[in-house]
Amino acid sequence: MAFETVFRETLDDGEPYEKFDTFLAGHMTHGRLSIDGIFCVTDKVAYYVMKALRRMNLRIPEDVQVIGFDGIRQLGDFDYICSTIVQPVEEMARISVGLLFREPSSARLHTYCLPVTYVCGGSTREPAP
């Protein structure tokens, strides 16, 4: 299986997503998208990606899978459901605050590996059992 990064533009939460719409349109051939999965940095970006895909009459997850990466499940549209990677935000905050209050001399660099959880929200296909 080959992975390819095909979209490197930065999309801010407040800006229109015309760049992404143009990108998607450029990857359509005979009504099909040439990619089958989109990984989004946040669930809010996943929400806008899913809206763009639906405007193009693409089915999620049958035609293209979408996954977010923060665990926010609802953004105002009642039909919004997205598969996501839930991050342990409280633990991330606790560790970060602890690091900020350390004395500079004791602030050795450490790597923290925190557990995340996959939550199926209907925008990814589930593997066969």
Model-derived features with residue positions:
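Bacterial carbohydrate/catabolite-sensing allosteric modules
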Residues: 1-129
